[in-house]
């Protein structure tokens, strides 16, 4: 029995069923593409945007809060208690944001940079402790000498690694975006 021999009502029912199936298939493909795009956006936000902020807060704590406290105490712009509070806040910000960053999904390049950071963190933390000790002792001359000769060599290599981690966030977010564009193009071709 051929298609031509079917009653018109049967042919219309089959045509309608085919159209419904095609519409459902297009909808499923569209939803799948949207799900993939949403997952990519979620990854970009949770594993790139938030970590970018965390890395910047760690960087600022070392490069701005600690260094600024040392210079302001040395120059007389910060009373001792304010400098100590700033140093404590910097240490807390570093610990909180670094541990939160480590809880995200790291790509292989990040893992390598995190290892580098961990090695450089000990001397930078020692520098923070030394600055804190000098501030507690009201040793302005010692703080001036330390800031001039030892503070930056302990901090600068750390900043380079943090800068590289920022770049990894941007590069990985770009790659995720390009993947989403590819998914969109593939879905668009199907539809």
Kindly label every feature range from the protein language model:
Residues 34, 93-94, 158:
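Hydrophobic residues within well-ordered alpha-helices
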Residues 155-166:
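Extended, hydrophilic extramembrane loops/domains of integral membrane proteins
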Residues 40-126, 130-154, 174-175:
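Membrane-proximal N-terminal soluble sensing/regulatory segments of transmembrane proteins
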Residues 21, 119-121, 161-162:
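Intrinsically disordered, low-complexity segments enriched in polar/charged residues with Gly/Pro
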Residues 1-53, 59-79, 98, 132-135, ...:
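Hydrophobic membrane-targeting segments
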């Amino acid at each position: 029995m051929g298609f031509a021999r079917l009653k018109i009502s049967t042919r219309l029912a089959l045509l309608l069923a085919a159209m419904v199936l095609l519409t459902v298939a297009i909808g499923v493909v569209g939803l799948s593409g949207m799900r993939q795009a949403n997952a990519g956006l979620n990854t970009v936000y949770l594993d790139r945007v938030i970590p970018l902020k965390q890395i910047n807060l760690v960087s600022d704590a070392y490069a701005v809060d600690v260094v600024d406290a040392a210079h302001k105490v040395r120059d007389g712009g910060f009373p001792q208690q304010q400098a100590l509070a700033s140093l404590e806040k910097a240490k807390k910000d570093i610990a909180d944001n670094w541990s939160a960053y480590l809880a995200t999904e790291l790509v292989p390049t990040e893992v390598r940079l995190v290892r580098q950071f961990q090695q450089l963190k000990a001397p930078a933390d020692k520098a923070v402790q030394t600055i804190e000790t000098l501030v507690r002792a009201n040793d302005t001359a010692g703080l001036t000498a330390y800031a001039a000769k030892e503070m930056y060599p302990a901090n600068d290599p750390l900043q380079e690694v943090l800068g590289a981690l920022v770049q990894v966030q941007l590069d990985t977010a770009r790659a995720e975006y390009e993947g989403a564009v590819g998914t969109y193009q593939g879905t668009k071709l199907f539809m």
